[in-house]
Amino acid sequence: MKKLQFAMVGGGNGALIGDIHRIGAQFDDLAELKAGCFSRHWDKNLEAGEKWGVEPGRIYPDYHTMLEEEAKRTGEDRLDFVVVATPNNTHYEIVKDIIAHGFHIVCDKPVTFTSRESEELKALAGKLDEINATHLDRRI
C-alpha cells in the first residue's frame, strides 16, 4: 500500500500540537511528511524540516508558496493532504487557501470562529469533493 504523503503548515520545533499531528499521522506507518512551512522564521523552518527528514526543496518560506508549488506536482509525487497546526485565528484563511489548491485537509481545532465561516468552508470543500477533517486531540 502506498503511504499517504502530507505537508504541514505550522507546528515547528517546540510546538506541541505539531508533534501530536506529525506523530499521529505517521503512527501506523501509512503516512509520510513530505513538505511544509513549519515557521515564519526561515532558520527555524529549515531546522524543523531537516529534523523531520523533509527534502530541502520542499521546505517553503510561507504556506502560499508551498501550496502553489505543491499543487504543480502530479502522480506519486503529489500530496494527499495538508495538516494545519497554526494559531487558531489563522485557520480559516489557511484552510480556504488549501481548498482552493485542491488538497484534503486535517486542521487543528477550531477550524473557524463563526458558523458563517464554517458553512463557507463546507460549501467550498464540498464542491471539490475534498475532505476537511478537524483534529480533536486527547478528547474522550
Please give the residue ranges for each predicted region:
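N-terminal Rossmann-like dinucleotide-binding module
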Residues: 1-54
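Rossmann-fold NAD(P) dinucleotide-binding segment
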Residues: 78-81, 89-108
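Aromatic/hydrophobic pocket-lining residues that form π-stacking "cages" and hydrophobic walls in ligand
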Residues: 45, 94, 121
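A short helix->loop->beta-strand "cap" motif at the edges of active sites that frequently abuts
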Residues: 55-56, 101-103, 128-130
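A structured beta-alpha segment of the ubiquitous adenosine-cofactor-binding alpha/beta core
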Residues: 58-80
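A contiguous active-site-proximal alpha/beta segment in oxidoreductase catalytic domains
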Residues: 112-140
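Hydrophobic Val/Ile/Leu positions in short beta-strands of Rossmann-like dinucleotide-binding domains
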Residues: 8-10, 84, 107, 111
